[in-house]
Amino acid sequence: MNYQVTVSGDPELAQESVDFVSSGFGNMSMNVNTTSSHHHHHSNSGNAEVSFNGGFGMPNMTMEVKETHSGHHHHHSNGGNAEISINSGFGMPSMTMSVTDSNSGHHHHHHKESASVNLSLGGIVGAVVGAVTGGVMIDGRNRIWVQLNQSSYVGGDIISGTIEMDCIVPFFAKGVIVKVKGFERLWLQELRTETEGEGSNKRTVYKTIDHKENKEFFKSTIVVYPQAGTVNCGHYSFPFSYQLPSDLPGTFCHDGKDAMGAYSAKILYKCKATVDVAHKHDLKSTTKLIINEKCGELVQPSFAENKKSFMLTKGKLHVKTWLNKNAYFPGETLVAKMKANNTSIKPTRKISLVVHHTMQLKTRLYHRCITNAIYKQQYDGFQPCFYGKRYLPFSIPVDLKPSSSLGKHITSSYLLELECDIPMAIDLSVTLPLTLFAPQFLYSTVPSQPPGTPLPPDVSYRHPWEGDEHATACRKCNKGFSLFARKHHCRHCMKIFCDKCTSTKTTITKLAYPKPVRVCEECYPIATQGGNKYQSAKLMAAQYQASLNAYYAQYASLYPQIYPDQQQQQQQPSAPPQQY
């Protein structure tokens, strides 16, 4: 039997179905099993079951056909009707179609028969295409990714980039979209101890309570290509842009556990590129955005100072500390400049730089503050009566979490503490704020400076302190020291004399002695004029400049693209200006 099928409906949807089938997804096969009976001059009925087997992963579909017709003897015209019900196994609505067939009756002979089938499809083809594409997995060789114009952003910046796609195996797509979002997510575990019952039934119960908070900063969908159709083999680029809201908190992600319970704190920003195919089988790729807090007025030199007196010893210790900036990247090296004026005879055994990290985690019903000293680096101390400058290099660990202070539920902050370890006394500490940006490992392929760039030299304005253990007699009168003949240091030359030879006192302005101090008879005339410095800061700065120029000259020869003008003119860059 031959069937002539005519389809009426949306031609574009029909064409999409043809394109879909012709794109290499597979073939359909149809099996028809019919049973019928007829007898001379009697009405007859027959049933047919038609099954469609999809060769490309779609579920099977069955169709039941019920037909009735009357048969006549000896070549009379016959008429019959058929009602066909189609049940799909993949989400299509059921549909029916009517079949009218006309054939010539026969007796003991078989003749060619024909049937005309009219299908009014309308949206049926679209439903078939949608259901089939929803069930098809995208070939794993097809790729999509996000290419951004910057490695990091701050609130208010415009994110610009392209969606790059490589198509190896063609497929049908509805469009290309980009989703950008930023959110804050906090989970806190509270370990609570409660007492239940009374009297002899009183008991202690340990409970674990979970606290959760979520806040969405922004969420947007950008349609970069709205047209539907078959994606052929090749490479595609779709540009897009999006302006971030201002005053966004910095990227932060940290999970941990302490005595109060576990916690998970996340401030994340994501950019997701999607080729809209259907349902869960979209071709997609997600890229995390690095957002730093806007800090136009934050990056500036940082300064702090502190001083202390001693209970049983005259004099004070006054320490000033500078940072040329207070915002750094993990892995970067900061240099802390310290200027100390110790007018006492107390030495400082060692100097330490300690990084303290503080997290504030807040939910509606629970709050936790977590503070830890996460990194410490030690340096040599200084002698009694030290007056001078020290430069302390400090390499920031790469695994430190970034700062984030604008979140509603999560804040992360750092402090850099300089500690002076003083024997038999409370330590002196100076605290500086420290901001860490989110790490950027790809922002430059060339190092900003060659490794091992020389540091500014340490400067000591006063002479080195002479140790008591080697002095047995006065340097001038040779009087031996004993329990009753005590040792005294001249505050100008720092040598040891007896009490009589250091009986004169005067201020020494150039050595930061504003009050009268002991000096020997030889140093007294110079001390009254302000004194002489042990080392000249200007002379040492000139020597440092020369060594730095030589070092940068070597750097310019290795990386001429950084200093093209100096390379052409054979001039070397000067030392960076001292901002502190």
From Swiss-Prot:
The record's annotation in InterPro entries points to: Arrestin-like_C (IPR014752), Arrestin-like_N (IPR011021), Arrestin_C-like (IPR011022), Arrestin_domain-protein (IPR050357), Ig_E-set (IPR014756), Znf_FYVE (IPR000306), Znf_FYVE-rel (IPR017455), Znf_FYVE_PHD (IPR011011)
Topology within the bilayer = Single-pass membrane protein
Q: Which GO terms describe its biological process?
A: cellular hyperosmotic response; cellular response to heat; cellular response to oxidative stress; protein transport; regulation of cellular response to stress
Compartments, as annotated in UniProt: Membrane
A Pfam family of this chain: Arrestin_N
Entry keyword set: Glycoprotein, Membrane, Metal-binding, Transmembrane, Transmembrane helix, Zinc, Zinc-finger
Sugar attachment sites are 27, 33, 60, 149, 341-342
Q: Entry's Gene3D superfamilies?
A: 2.60.40.640, Zinc/RING finger domain, C3HC4 (zinc finger)
The superkingdom of the source organism is Eukaryota
Quote a single Gene Ontology cellular component term.
cytoplasm
The keyword Glycoprotein is annotated on this UniProt entry: yes
**Stretch list, region Disordered:** 31-54, 67-86, 95-114
MF (Gene Ontology): phosphatidylinositol-3-phosphate binding; zinc ion binding
| Membrane-spanning intervals of the chain | 118-138
ZnF (FYVE-type) spans are: 468-528
Q: Which residues bind Zn(2+) 1?
A: 474, 477, 498, 501
What positions does the entry give for Zn(2+) 2 binding?
A: 490, 493, 520, 523
The Swiss-Prot or TrEMBL record describes its family as follows: Belongs to the arrestin family.
Can you say what this protein is called? Answer: Arrestin domain-containing protein A
Q: Which gene encodes it?
A: adcA
